């Protein structure tokens, strides 16, 4: 149902923070909302799929500025070393909320992680996650396409060409998360 899909996206962005973060959970009792973390960035993909189904350019124009703000939020608040590759994190510095942000709450790849403070209400894991950065690279491509539909300027840095190479371990022939301190691979295959 296209209208339901649009309303779901609108509801998600109704709770976008002033910085651009989309909060994890929204409840009928707002005191229960989880504002400690976000979730993987898939919103531009959702909007792109809605557009393909409806050709509703007005919806894209309505949501596009919020999508772009969310995309920029990742690089501003979840890129500890400002190298263009992001980390999952939390607002309050808790490791648990960082795992929630990944959507893989109990993933063993986070077992030896710690938190690094980026800003007043911005913390990152001490590892850059391959899945997060793959999502962000794909979101970049979709935002570029959606900018044409929304008739908006798009000047975001293109990190898509370097993402796969950065996370690929040629010796093991596998994609791994990277430790921030050494940029060595987190040798965990799978979750």
Residue spans of the language-model regions?
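Alpha-helical support elements that line or immediately flank enzyme active sites
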Residues: 1-16, 190-191
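Active/binding-pocket-proximal capping segment
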Residues: 11-16, 153, 160-162
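Alpha-helical solenoid repeat scaffolds, predominantly canonical TPR units
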Residues: 8, 63, 70, 157-160
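The feature captures the catalytic groove of carbohydrate-active enzymes
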Residues: 19, 23-42, 48-52, 57-61, ...
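Structured ligand/cofactor/substrate-binding pocket environments in proteins
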Residues: 1-3, 62-68
């Amino acid at each position: 149902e296209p209208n339901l899909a649009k309303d779901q996206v609108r509801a998600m962005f109704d709770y976008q923070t002033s910085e651009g973060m989309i909060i994890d959970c929204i409840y009928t009792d707002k005191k229960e909302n989880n504002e400690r973390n976000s979730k993987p960035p898939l919103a531009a993909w959702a909007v792109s799929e809605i557009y393909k189904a409806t050709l509703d350019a007005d919806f894209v124009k309505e949501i596009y500025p919020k999508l772009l703000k969310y995309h920029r939020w990742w690089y501003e608040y979840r890129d500890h070393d400002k190298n263009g590759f992001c980390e999952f994190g939390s607002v309050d510095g808790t490791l648990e909320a960082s795992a929630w942000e990944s959507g893989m709450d109990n993933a063993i790849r986070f077992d030896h992680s710690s938190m690094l403070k980026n800003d007043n209400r911005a913390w990152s894991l001490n590892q850059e996650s391959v899945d997060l950065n793959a999502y962000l690279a794909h979101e970049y491509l979709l935002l570029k396409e959606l900018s044409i539909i929304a008739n908006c300027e798009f000047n975001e840095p293109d990190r898509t060409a370097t993402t796969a190479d950065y996370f690929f371990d040629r010796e093991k022939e596998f994609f791994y998360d990277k430790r921030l301190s050494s940029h060595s691979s987190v040798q965990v295959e799978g979750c």
